[in-house]
Structures are given as structure tokens and as C-alpha cells.
Amino acid sequence: MGKVSVRLFLNDGYEAPPEEEDLFIDMHSEEYCGMISRSLLQLGNPYRIRKAIEKSKAGKEVTLAYIGGSITQGAGAIPIHTECYAYKSFQLFQNRFSTQNNVRFIKAGVGGTPSELGMIRFDRDVLREGERPDIVVIEFAVNDEGDETKGVCYESLVRKVLKLPWKPAVVLLFSVFANDWNLQERLRPVGDLYDLPMVSILNAVTPQFSLKCGEGRI
């Protein structure tokens, strides 16, 4: 029997790294819990998220949607569709808050796209065929560097989602570039204004890069 291996690469400046053996990570360690704690910039008003969780626990269908750039698409993840942060967090939500197979997943990540295009893609890639997501994660903290509006398009996308008739929850995710840079200082005021949950990968992982084993590195 023949065996074929297929590996996908994104044509946006990213290359998938070689596969490495996963090291054991103690998710109850002080270091790990500290990293997770640093990632939460703001809890915000949890009402809409709580409603989605209650809906899922009641056995009703809940949809999680993710829109962003190549990081949301899965750049660097192997396999790209099941090891990306979007799918992993969807799985975690499903395992924690679902008593049956009632949680659905939409991934609308496209490499190299800013929130200016995200405003258009949201209709095409998320709301397609009458979809009504209950939670929407927005990730453009790397791709919006060239945004001439300096955050106006980003806020417009956030407002567009918040104003949907069924009132989905919105989570702002601030990913980080390879040189420890992102745009969370520009975009965070949007989350402050609308009292939204905000998660910073920059705050969570960059302190780890200078640590050695035995110094709290995870």
C-alpha cells in the first residue's frame, strides 16, 4: 500500500517549522499559571460569553468563529487545521462547556489580510449561509501595521460584530510577531471602550524567551 504525506505551506512569508518532539508541560505549575495570568489584559463584561456558555451547557447549538490573519489561519502549526490556536481553543470550549456534540467551529483566517479587509471578509467568510456565531475572536494585532486609519477599520469591525441582532460575544486577541512586536497599544483602547475581553500573546510568552531551563521557562 502506498503512503503519501502532504504538507501545506502559506505563501505569506511564513514557513512551517520542522516537527519537534513535544516536551511535557505541567499546566498546574506556578510558571504556567503565571503565563496564563499575564495573557489576560482585561476580563471585560463577561455577560455575552456567559450566555454562550449557558447555551452550550443546555445542549443548544453554539458556534465559535475566528477571524484574522495568518496566525488565525494556522501559520507554523502542523497540521495547520488541527494544531492552530483557533481549533485548540474551540476544542477546549467544547470539552469544558458541552455535554454533547453541539459546538460548531468557523475559522476565517487569511494570511496577510488586515482588519480593513476583515470588515468585508466577515460577511463572506463568517456569516456565510446564514451563520450566527455566538462568540467571535478577532485577531489583527500583527497585520494592521499598514492601516492608514490607525485603528478606525479595526473598531468598525468590532462594532459591526457587536451590533449583530443576536448579540454575539467578542474577544480581542493580540498575537505577536517574531520580533516581539504587535499593535496592542494601538488597538487596546477599542477593547477598553467597549469593555471587551482581551488576550495578549505578547504579554504571555515574550518574558519566556529570555529564560533558561530551571529559571521558570516552560
Residue ranges and their predicted role:
Residues L8-Y14, K57-K60, E83-I218:
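Alpha-helical cap/lid subdomain in secreted, periplasmic
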